[in-house]
Regions:
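PEST-like low-complexity, intrinsically disordered acidic/proline/serine-rich tracts
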Residues: 1-242
Length: 242
């Protein structure tokens, strides 16, 4: 049991945030976010399955080598939910969208990251530049903001994708307090064909609180210090046998 005054090592909504019951959710009778092509995510191609297996094998072999070998989320760099495509995780799911001349900015509560999307018809970055969030370019089709994103790094794989991931997002206000978010993902090295999903976002009064990650990131430090202690113990045991 925790003693009085102790804090849990990991995230606890009762101590560091609002309870999940405060969330505003757009409910519906749908059973899946996926809407095309057949209402389900296509199976991974053999190339993508091999890529995933190689990543998993490398992670098992080197997971305790150092900070660089730990997952991006554990290092407070990025979470898979940040996208694109942007899919709500179990917590820190709020977004704040700000429009300005030539740009749209989407501030995400998770890790307090901001996507800055030019809407000035500028070209994508050169193909040899790869980013965690990819390179996004937006334009308007009527009342719908369409965002095209390429230039991903393989470190932020989405459901088995690689650097060739291509994401098209659509943001459409359907009511004063709702936005329909649609996305289509394509990667010829991952799936035989593109697939799409959609979800409705509900408006929240706010504000979006600052997300602090490294300030309480005991997990990575404890993992690595534990690994070093285990290695030291093994080395001492081996030396004692000589």
């Amino acid at each position: 049991m925790k003693e009085t005054g102790d804090l849990a090592v990991h995230y606890d909504t009762s101590q560091f945030g609002l309870d999940r019951s405060h969330a505003t959710v757009a409910t519906s009778n749908r059973t899946s976010l996926v809407v095309g092509p057949e209402g389900r995510v296509p199976p991974l191609l053999p190339e993508a399955q091999k890529r995933q297996a190689e990543r998993a094998a490398y992670q098992r072999e080197h997971q305790w080598d150092g900070p660089e070998s730990r997952p991006l989320a554990e290092r407070c760099i990025t979470w898979p939910s940040e996208g694109p495509p942007m899919l709500a995780p179990g917590y820190n799911s709020n977004l704040q969208i700000v429009q300005g001349k030539g740009y749209v900015a989407i501030m995400q509560e998770m890790i307090h990251d901001v996507r800055i999307i030019p809407t000035d018809n500028s070209a994508h970055l050169p193909s040899n530049i790869h980013l965690y969030f990819g390179d996004s370019r937006g334009h308007w089709e009527g009342n719908t903001l369409v965002v095209d994103t390429t230039n991903f790094t393989d470190k932020t794989a989405f459901r088995g994708s690689g650097e060739k991931l291509h994401v098209v997002e659509k943001f459409t206000r359907t009511a004063d307090d709702a936005i329909k978010y649609e996305f289509t993902v394509d990667d010829a090295t991952a799936w035989a064909k593109p697939w799409s999903a959609e979800v409705t976002w509900a408006k929240e009064a706010g504000p979006v609180f600052e997300y602090a990650c490294q300030e309480g990131n005991y997990g990575m430090k404890n993992n690595l210090s534990g690994a070093r202690a285990t290695e030291k113990k093994a080395a001492e045991a081996a030396a004692a046998k000589k």
